[in-house]
């Protein structure tokens, strides 16, 4: 699969938000500091967050229960690590469970998708008054690493894939009031979508001429810096970053996908995104946070799809969980397997979860399940995770409430704790705060769970203990 730039996209390349240029500067009025002393573990070079938008049904997926409503073709069997597992949905992931830690003692704060997704991406409660200034976790990570850019880096620190341009379930959260250099490089793997940073054959000369014109303007700017608008200087910085990326001989290797590998990853937008994530990690070219979106998990109706698909037929055609899980299964298992084979998994931290769980008990009148914040599950892999193959936490027979926590605090694991863990594995002090925000309020990397800070957030240390 060769994703080349179209002629129209080429004309818009200056609008692509990229970072990593030596000319990129952070706003002078925004300062980061910490009043606490923590020791980030720094066990990963990159994080991949697989964001299951809509909220998967925990009792059918990562916390399988054999209920009256459970279809027989979910094929509940013991996986190699002893966990009851839905082989009918995740046969390939069963083969990599010994490389993961399955956490079942997680909960959410909210039951609305956009607020739940805000927690997923920012690690904060949504505030309408501050929404425009609040940066995402990916942009904070980009800010931290912009000052550590190496001369060999040609990719931005933050890459986000498969986010729709608008979504009632929560849009992609970007840089807020941070410098535009911390905004993500967005990649859409839908069929027929071109990527505005790959040069098509025959366009190199045109690209070079535009760069020469920009450099001529830069010469004039040096003669009279005051005459150049600030927005143009930012655009100039982005364009130089884009030039570094587009002219790199490695960029084509990352975004040109081998057909056999695509088949193994499922040959879907989800599979292609995970395959590109693998290539980005292998390139070691500056990317630190990869956010991959898979929508469609909001199964208020027909969670088990069409009932007229017989066992033995292609269950993916049934829709509902069957289709989504098949896409995730091939993509997730392919990513974990390939990173492990390339000795990259130990330095890559992978998180796979949704914003909340779904209602236990009987299906609703539409044959679906509604929102349930009391229980959700996640898969973690790599990045220093120890004793993979184990399970942390447990729920009751209906997956309705947590019955065993398996971690140091006497409460469920919340989104803020996941955020703190991601910062920690990247070597970032999660207790930092940024002053000088437009609202006058500090932005804390991870917000305490109460206005007084009495209930603090922390990394999930048990992931890294044998």
Regions found by a protein language model. Give the residues of each.
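Ligand-binding pockets and gating/stacking loops
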Residues: 1-466
